[in-house]
Amino acid sequence: MVCLFGVGIGSGCGCTNYRNEEDAYDIEAKYGYSPDEMFNVTFFNTRVEQFYQFYKKDMISNLGTMDEGLYCLKRLEDAGKLKCIITRDIFSLARRAGCQNVYELHGSVYKNTCPHCGREYPLEYIRDSKGAPVCEDCGSVIRPGVSMVGEIVDNGLISQAAEEV
């Protein structure tokens, strides 16, 4: 068995969902840009301070709480009945529930990287930094470990996930 789930699982757990109409309206009123405009690779590259203000306050401030359905997936995996989970969730809900074989097609807020030197940073470093987080080694702005609007999902990862199905 293979489990496929999208961002809806996160909404059910209370994770931030900027695609929710009411939340999207509130974000646009707050920042003057829609969530799709702000959670965009071009916005990140040209307005990094504004991007991180939005990202920290409105994207990663509420990572949700685990629900029984996620722990059920872990039990199925432990019993050898669940081959893998393929998800668009960026909050690593399946991994947080203890599942091992997870394909996070859109990445994870928990894995962040310096685009210059490759050093990895945990979510806490991003969240606790003042302004845009910078690499301690080279000073470059750290890149969130998630696919943003306007980016292509890793084709190799898509191929691996397709092989599982």
PLM regions: where:
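Conserved catalytic core of sirtuin-type NAD+-dependent deacylases
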Residues: 1-165
